[in-house]
Amino acid sequence: MFYMKKNLTFSLLAILFCWNVNAQIFTPGHHIKCYFTRPVDTTVARGEKAISLIRTAGDTVISYINRAKYTLDILMYDFVEDSLWFEHGNIPNIALAINNAYARGVKIRWITNTIDTEYSPNTGLDSINPNIPVIHSPTGGSYGIMHNKIMIIDGRSSNPNDPIVWTGSMNWETGQIDKDANNLVIIQDSAFAHGYLIEFNQMWGDTVEGGPSNHANSKFGPFKKDITPHNYTIDGHRVESYFSPVDSVNKHILETMESAKTEVDLGVFEWSETVDANEVGTLQNKGLYMAAIIDQYSTQYTAYGTLSNILGPMMVTYFGVDSLFHNKYMIIDPCNMEAGPAVLTGSHNWTLEADEYNDENTIVIHDSTTANLFYQAFHKEFYSLGGTLTQHCVPLGINEITDNDAVNIYPIPTQNYLSVHLNVLLQNATYHIYNVMGQNVVNGKLDSDNTNTVDVSTLSTGVYVIQVQSANRQFSRKFCKE
């Protein structure tokens, strides 16, 4: 009897702690997370190392969908699941996660682009529970496309630790997850989520959780109003938020570029705006260090030739055979802490269409850590394309990294694999996983230079502690196995 009670107690504790672990993915002071779908160069890290989710970004999508307790409001340009995901033994079944969320009572609303068989077929919607309300963007000469890549999780929750906004440049589509260069930005902030809900509700035409769209009130593109907040403070950093086309985003792109004191690094998929290209030349003539990665899709535009003439070898072009450089970011002063480093990113390509016709989102994060994370991705991509940067960020010393930042583990909760990322150099590092009874259940070695994958598929559902240690340092992190 005592044994049964003991096991029951531990089972209940596991369930309770699982909930707590799930709620604490974002630790105090760390409410902005960035991930990248292609390799990064952590040798230029100034503290925190960037995390690349190579062919695993779909798992991260699912992990955040599984966090939802009350609501999911999704604006996604393209959602496609196909057999290519089976190639790598990694089947991030986003549709199943959505349906499971709906089955457990999460109220879901979905806005997508009008189906375009070439660019946004949205075949993944065929697998979504038909009771989940979905609306498509309008068509017509005065409107472009619904190009956002946004998920708002528990945006209305009264608990300030619940609301999360998922954004960045990645569509929920096979190539975007497995092959293309994209960035993901995940922000846990109640006020920020409320601002994104205002935008969503304006397009939906109603505010009812999980309710049908009110087409009479629904507004897209140039028919929307500028009613969302534009400035937030998150983790002590200013974060700007803009929605196209009503917020004149190209103007804010120029303003952000012009705010640079020493350096601007650009990573843009589609660039047709010549005024932005000319500004690159103006800043370079003022002595600023300028560098750019541009996708081959932009070679059709005059702006590409302008940039090529201005930047010369400081611009590289991504000529992917079956992949894209799909980012739309700008890094301001990543190596100058006193200049106010910042990152601009989102769904907004640097085109007239994005500025005047499309539904897009853009954020500007004024934070040196975020700027350096993007710089690690930029640095790696620039060199992989044959370029050479003549100016580099100098890495900070190991003593400038806090213990809270030393080890990152994700996703939480996890099902089969746990990624362990070391932000400090640990010689002969090992890991040891313990269950709630203090029993050592898994052990292994860690590579300090890479993100490590730990197989936890054989563990029972519950809470565990992973202990990372070397000869003179030790760190512990708690995680939940679903």
Predicted regions and their residues:
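Bacterial Sec-dependent N-terminal signal peptides
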Residues: 1-25, 480
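HKD-type phospholipase D/PLD-like phosphodiesterase module
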Residues: 24-67, 78-256, 293-368
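A structural signal for isolated positions on well-ordered beta-strands in alpha/beta enzyme cores
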Residues: 73, 107-111, 265, 291-293, ...
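Hydrophilic extracytoplasmic domains
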Residues: 361, 365-384
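Short, compositionally biased serine/threonine- and acidic-rich segments at solvent-exposed termini, linkers
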Residues: 395-396
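C-terminal outer-membrane/trafficking sorting elements
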Residues: 400-482
